[in-house]
């Protein structure tokens, strides 16, 4: 249930107090924590992505001002101190869908890790929020995405965002489908966005020789198997072999721009905002439902039990501003 309490915030020299407008949870990390699939200590504050307005800021803060609309990695609550990334975004994005920027940031890190070339095929396993953004970003990069998921509704959302090639393994052989679409060569890149170990180890089935598998989704749950066939697929010089494995955790890149790295979370946030405003990156079709924070229990039931209908839970905090 929603917990109401008075809280005093103190902004230090670099602190930013944020009045939340909309916050977002996907069906991944938070559900894994609440279900016990990912071990965490309680009590636990949940949620880590939201947009809102800047209230007081510390004396050394220069990148945002009072009244700015910002995205930040903050909890599901009406007021929060900005956490690490606080990125100013245009007022045009003061809407529920923009709270999903954080999921697009995860996907973009995967694309930047893989660095697909113009004309490459990119297989994306998992059509949750991250996978749906990854497929769109792959297409924007000049690659040909193939999106694989067990849920027809998710693939319908993908097609509404312009992703033409989708595969449901329940209805067809996924490997055969990928090979048909790649003239039997396999994909240059596989982005594993589910975090499900069985899906991760089967990702080699979709890769072509010298291909790359990038782990975007965080792995969870126990999985016992003979790992040798997977390692052979990665190691041996044969069709679909000699593969490169790379991790693409969201936090692998710096938060702020600097002179020594090409990518940062700040730069990525600004890039995604630009793509959204240019209507090149679709976000509205990915909104399943916007919840009142009072309905948090229902929201997480929907995320865990109705993945066929709910991609993510967005909470509207605008009725809790005082």
Features from the language model and the residues they span:
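C-terminal capping/lid region of NAD(P)-dependent oxidoreductase domains
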Residues: 184, 209, 214, 223-224, ...
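C-terminal substrate-binding/catalytic core of Rossmann-like NAD(P)-dependent dehydrogenases/reductases
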Residues: 175-179, 227-287
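Mid-domain Rossmann-like dinucleotide-binding core that forms the NAD(H)/NADP(H) cofactor-binding site
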Residues: 97-172, 176
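Local beta-strand N-terminus motif with an aromatic residue
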Residues: 83-85, 119, 163, 183-187, ...
């Amino acid at each position: 249930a929603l917990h109401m309490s008075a809280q005093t915030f103190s902004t230090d020299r670099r602190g930013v107090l944020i009045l939340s407008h909309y916050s977002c949870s996907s069906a991944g990390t938070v559900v894994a924590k609440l279900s016990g699939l990912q071990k965490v200590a309680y009590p636990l504050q949940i949620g880590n992505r939201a947009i809102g307005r800047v209230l007081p800021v510390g004396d050394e803060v220069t990148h945002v001002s009072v009244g700015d609309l910002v995205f930040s990695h903050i909890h599901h609550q009406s007021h929060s101190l900005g956490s690490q990334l606080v990125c100013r975004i245009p007022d045009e994005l003061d809407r529920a869908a923009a709270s999903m920027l954080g999921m697009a940031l995860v996907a973009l890190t995967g694309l930047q890790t893989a660095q697909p070339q113009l004309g490459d095929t990119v297989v994306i396993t998992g059509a949750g929020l991250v996978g749906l953004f990854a497929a769109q970003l792959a297409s924007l990069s000049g690659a040909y995405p193939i999106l694989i998921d067990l849920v027809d509704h998710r693939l319908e959302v993908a097609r509404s965002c312009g992703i033409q090639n989708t595969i449901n393994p329940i209805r067809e052989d996924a490997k055969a489908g990928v090979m048909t679409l790649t003239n039997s060569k396999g994909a240059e890149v596989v982005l594993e966005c589910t975090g499900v170990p069985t899906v991760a180890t089967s990702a080699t089935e979709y890769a072509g020789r010298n291909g790359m598998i990038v782990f975007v989704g965080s792995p969870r749950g126990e999985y016992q198997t003979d790992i040798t066939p997977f390692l052979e697929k990665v190691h041996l010089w044969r069709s679909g072999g000699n593969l490169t494995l790379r991790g693409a955790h969201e936090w692998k890149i710096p938060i702020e721009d600097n002179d020594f790295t090409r990518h940062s979370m700040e730069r990525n946030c600004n890039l995604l905002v630009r793509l959204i405003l240019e209507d090149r990156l679709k976000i509205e079709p990915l909104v399943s439902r916007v919840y009142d924070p009072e309905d948090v229990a229902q929201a997480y039931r929907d995320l865990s039990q109705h993945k066929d209908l709910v991609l993510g839970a967005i909470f509207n905090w605008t009725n809790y501003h005082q």
